[in-house]
Swiss-Prot record:
This is U-myrmeciitoxin(01)-Mg4b. Residues 1-25 form the signal peptide. May have antimicrobial properties, like most ant linear peptides. Not detected in the venom. Expressed by the venom gland. It is found in: Secreted. Contains 2 intrachain disulfide bonds (per chain) and 1 interchain disulfide bond.
Length: 64
């Protein structure tokens, strides 16, 4: 029971951060990131109106 709840919680956290990043990206005018898993895709950073990519750390390795 606890493992199922933890798994659902992790999905909710990852999904919410994905939505927040999408909203912030559209506000600052960054292009949409590719639909890869949230922990493995590029994070959009705008510098001088040029999008830059930074890999996010793998969250699954820390939780596993």
């Amino acid at each position: 029971m606890g493992k199922i709840f933890f798994f659902v919680l992790m999905i909710a956290i990852i999904g919410s951060t994905f939505l927040i990043e999408e909203a912030l990206g559209s506000l600052v005018g960054c292009p949409r990131p590719n639909f890869l898993p949230s922990w493995n895709r590029c994070k959009c950073i705008c510098k001088n109106n040029k999008p830059m990519c930074r890999k996010l750390p793998n969250l699954l390795k820390t939780t596993a």
